[in-house]
Amino acid sequence: MLRALLLISACLTASIAHALTSAEARGMAIGDSTSRIEALNKAATDPDEKTAAFIQALADDAVKTAGGTVFIVKDDKATDPVTGAALKLPDDAEDVTNNNLMRGELDNALASLKLFSKDPKARADAIKTLASG
């Protein structure tokens, strides 16, 4: 709950969103849960649209990695999370696995992002998600 409140506070004070970098995408997708959550919380403090889309892709289990490269896979098509460019998915690409702790943090990050939605229902749902976390 404290993390969620800190994330909300950071989002409210952020003035300019910075673009998702390859290093941030790798940090959120590769490594142990603790380091991935740290990278997620850092990226979610002032996200751009690509960062928000990448967080959603992580939550949707639509992210794979191979050789330190991160891919978003949708409809059997791989794209670069930073540029959006189409990429060839290597045969040895592995699914990014989210344990329950990571899933909870992804849900909180997505809810925090939805606090700024123009849709009142989305904002209300976000508040409920954060309050229950």
Predicted stretch roles:
Residues 14-16:
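N-terminal signal peptide c-region/cleavage motif recognized by signal peptidases
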Residues 1-8:
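Sec-dependent signal peptide recognition
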